């Protein structure tokens, strides 16, 4: 999903900066340990403020900035007048290093948005000391400013946004990693992701040791050569794809800061599927809830249902494999190895990248209590042919996903066994 947002205000200017890290540390990488929750991958490695306050941040490839749940509620500091009991937050009133930035960046409100849907997502701005492992910087924060009552606590206290940054973007909508790169806290603007999944009984999964016992690792400042398969990294330049805000991630006001790349071919096995010829076709990388499932069109999903002899099924809400609006279909669990891969090509003459059948089949439970295998496919778009889709957990299995903040490009590599 993209589960939370709650924001507040504060600001900027000339105040003591965070102490510089030693030179060798500035040039090294940091591995963010990731745990997989319903909303997506969260990390506990970041602290904010003085004295340092612990956080649990949602690492979100599709959010613009360093969003922080604060005490702000209806323009007061009555945090739990808006937040649900038990909600974790950053108490900005207790940080001696926080600086108000409302004079630099006006309050922003998005409605609709993909966190609170038709409730206001409002942010006010401040700067404070932000620590990622042993690295620290003074960053601009998006502080939550709620004007409504949350009905439940969200599983994190902020967002570690990782959207790409455009030249015209000021610090109020810049990813925290990008802000730290600009302050030379990292030698490189590269970041990489590996997924040590363990949700496919009967199949070989990456050892949790590869992720230091975690569900995933988001490496900041580069990538580990040991993870890259023998074919190396394929780099694809990102594109701005305006239809994303009409049918995929819908915000008002709109923004287009996504790791989106063009799709030039789409296959089921070796059978090519139709693309949209009017708008072109693209995918967005999102390893949170909107990125679950294999990205397919109405027509290609229908074809996969036919090939796999899948049958319509009603699933319990708790076991739905993704949050798409399409129907779900069950398949014979014993035939999974015979099903074709779902494939994509991201540029003429480039490699074809696959989601193997075992990666797009998920276990679920029917309304009458039966355990079934289902096609974990998510369909977005208008009309029959492929327009846009999101690639996340299912695509990331057995791959390394890289983002280059300095050149705005996506890198793909096989995850070395």
Curated annotation (Swiss-Prot):
What is the residue range of the signal peptide feature? 1-20
Q: A Pfam family name for this chain? A: Asp
What transmembrane ranges does the database entry give? none
One GO term describing the cellular component: extracellular region
| Enzyme Commission number, as recorded | 3.4.23.-
InterPro entries the UniProt entry points to:
Aspartic_peptidase_A1, PEPTIDASE_A1, Peptidase_aspartic_dom_sf
User: Where are the disulfide bridges?
Assistant: 333-373
Q: Where is the Peptidase A1 domain?
A: 42-413
Give the GO biological process terms. Answer: proteolysis
- Positions annotated with a glycan in the UniProt record: 74, 91, 100, 170, 276, 314
Where does it reside?
Secreted
Q: Which UniProt keywords apply?
A: Aspartyl protease, Disulfide bond, Glycoprotein, Hydrolase, Protease, Secreted, Signal
What is a single molecular function from GO for this protein?
A: aspartic-type endopeptidase activity
Similarity section: Belongs to the peptidase A1 family.
What PANTHER family does the database record attribute to this sequence? BETA-SITE APP-CLEAVING ENZYME, ISOFORM A-RELATED (PTHR47966:SF51)
Q: What does this protein do?
A: Probable secreted aspartic protease that supplies the fungus with nutrient amino acids. May be able to degrade the selected host's proteins involved in the immune defense.
Give the protein name, as stated in the record.
Probable secreted aspartic protease ARB_07536
Q: Which organism is it from?
A: Arthroderma benhamiae (strain ATCC MYA-4681 / CBS 112371)
């Amino acid at each position: 999903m993209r589960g939370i947002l709650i924001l507040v205000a504060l600001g900027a200017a000339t105040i003591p900066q965070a102490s510089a890290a030693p030179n060798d540390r500035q040039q090294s990488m940091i591995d963010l340990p990731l745990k997989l929750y319903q909303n997506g991958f969260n990390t506990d490695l970041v602290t904010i403020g003085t004295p340092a306050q612990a956080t649990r941040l949602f690492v979100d490839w599709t959010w613009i900035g360093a969003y922080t749940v604060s005490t702000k509620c209806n323009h007061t500091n009555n945090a739990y007048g808006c937040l649900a009991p038990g909600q974790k937050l950053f108490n900005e009133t207790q940080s001696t290093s926080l600086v108000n930035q409302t004079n630099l960046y006006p309050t922003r409100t998005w409605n609709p948005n993909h966190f609170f849907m038709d409730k206001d997502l409002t942010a006010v701005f401040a700067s404070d000391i932000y620590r990622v492992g042993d690295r620290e910087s003074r960053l601009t924060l998006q502080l939550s400013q709620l004007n409504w009552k949350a009905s439940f606590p969200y599983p994190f206290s902020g967002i570690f946004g990782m959207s790409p940054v455009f030249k015209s973007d000021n610090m109020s909508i810049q990813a925290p990693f990008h802000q730290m790169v600009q302050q030379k806290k990292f030698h490189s603007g590269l970041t990489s992701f590996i997924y040590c999944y363990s949700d496919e009984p009967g199949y070989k999964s990456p050892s949790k040791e590869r992720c230091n016992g975690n569900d995933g690792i988001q490496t900041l400042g580069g990538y580990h050569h040991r993870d890259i398969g023998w074919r190396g990294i394929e780099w694809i330049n990102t594109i701005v794809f305006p239809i994303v805000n009409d049918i995929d991630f819908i915000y008002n006001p709109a923004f287009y800061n996504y790791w989106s790349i063009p799709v030039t071919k789409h296959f089921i096995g070796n059978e090519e599927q139709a693309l949209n010829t009017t708008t072109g076709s693209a995918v967005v990388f999102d390893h949170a809830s909107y990125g679950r499932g294999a990205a397919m069109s109405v027509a290609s999903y229908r074809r996969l249902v036919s090939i796999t002899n899948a049958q319509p099924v009603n699933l319990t809400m708790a076991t739905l494999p993704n949050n798409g609006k399409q129907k779900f279909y069950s398949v014979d669990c014993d035939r999974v190895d015979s099903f074709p891969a779902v494939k994509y090509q991201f540029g003429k003459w480039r490699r074809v990248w696959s989601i193997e059948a075992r990666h797009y089949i998920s276990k679920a439970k029917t309304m009458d209590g039966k355990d079934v295998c289902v096609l974990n496919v998510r369909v977005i778009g208008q009309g029959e042919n492929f327009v846009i889709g999101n690639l996340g957990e299912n695509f990331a299995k057995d791959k390394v996903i890289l983002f280059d903040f300095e050149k705005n490009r996506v890198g793909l590599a096989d995850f070395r066994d």
